[in-house]
């Protein structure tokens, strides 16, 4: 029997911390659906399409990973994919408090869904996509945190965003 799990997230951009969770999760699960979310509560730097492309490129060598984008409740996507296990990475206590709320609400909608929490490896415990973008915005090196092919895309996108914002006048 194949054991499948879904790892949803915004992945804006996908980091080595995310990849570490995927690789470690494969010790438990045969197949992992990497579900790239269009999150209405966030304002991602990259479009859903771009983030899906990055995720596919970053996981191309991992034959057990299937990447797709979605714009729906995670629980609905899980039902469509017939997946009952949700993977979530935890870096710290605040992640846990947030993720426990999501796990409980997912169980409310479907008592067949189980959430598996994976503790971040120490080296990635302080890493977030938001932090990567902030470091890049101020000219810091981000090549230790994200795949090399994404580094230039982040820098380019931030430059373009900065140029657009300079055209805005404040009173």
Swiss-Prot record:
Report the catalytic activity: (R)-4'-phosphopantetheine + ATP + H(+) = 3'-dephospho-CoA + diphosphate
The UniProt entry, under Pfam families, shows: CTP_transf_like
Annotated substrate binding sites: 10, 42, 74, 88
Q: What class of enzyme is it?
A: transferase
Q: What EC number(s) does this enzyme carry?
A: 2.7.7.3
- Pathway where it operates: Cofactor biosynthesis; coenzyme A biosynthesis; CoA from (R)-pantothenate: step 4/5
Q: Where in the cell is it found?
A: Cytoplasm
- Which cofactors, by name? Mg(2+)
Q: Which Gene Ontology molecular-function terms are recorded? A: ATP binding; pantetheine-phosphate adenylyltransferase activity
GO biological process terms held by the UniProt record: coenzyme A biosynthetic process
Q: Which UniProt keywords apply?
A: ATP-binding, Coenzyme A biosynthesis, Cytoplasm, Magnesium, Nucleotide-binding, Nucleotidyltransferase, Transferase
Q: List, alphabetically, the GO terms of the cellular component aspect.
A: cytoplasm
Provide the site residues for: Transition state stabilizer.
18
Annotated positions binding ATP? 10-11, 18, 89-91, 99, 124-130
Summarize the protein's role.
Reversibly transfers an adenylyl group from ATP to 4'-phosphopantetheine, yielding dephospho-CoA (dPCoA) and pyrophosphate.
Among PANTHER family, the record links this protein to:
PHOSPHOPANTETHEINE ADENYLYLTRANSFERASE
Quaternary structure annotation from Swiss-Prot or TrEMBL = Homohexamer.
**Family label:** Belongs to the bacterial CoaD family.
Supply the name of the protein.
Answer: Phosphopantetheine adenylyltransferase
Tell me what organism the protein belongs to.
Blochmanniella pennsylvanica (strain BPEN)
Q: What is the lineage of its organism?
A: Bacteria, Pseudomonadati, Pseudomonadota, Gammaproteobacteria, Enterobacterales
């Amino acid at each position: 029997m194949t054991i499948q799990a879904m790892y949803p997230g915004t992945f804006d951009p996908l980091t080595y911390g995310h990849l570490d969770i995927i690789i470690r999760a494969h010790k438990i699960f045969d197949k992992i659906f990497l579900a790239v979310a269009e999150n209405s509560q966030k304002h991602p730097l990259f479009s859903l399409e771009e983030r899906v492309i990055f995720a596919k490129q970053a996981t191309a060598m991992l034959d057990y990973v299937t990447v797709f984008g979605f714009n729906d409740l995670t629980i609905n996507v899980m039902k469509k994919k017939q997946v009952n296990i949700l993977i979530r990475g935890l870096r710290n206590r605040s992640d846990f408090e947030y993720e426990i709320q999501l796990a409980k609400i997912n169980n409310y909608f479907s008592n067949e869904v189980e959430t598996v929490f994976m503790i971040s490896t120490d080296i990635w415990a302080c890493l977030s996509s938001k932090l990567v973008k902030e470091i890049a915005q101020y000219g810091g090196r981000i090549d230790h945190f994200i795949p090399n092919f994404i580094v230039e895309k982040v820098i380019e996108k931030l430059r373009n965003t900065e140029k657009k914002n300079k055209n805005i006048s404040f009173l």
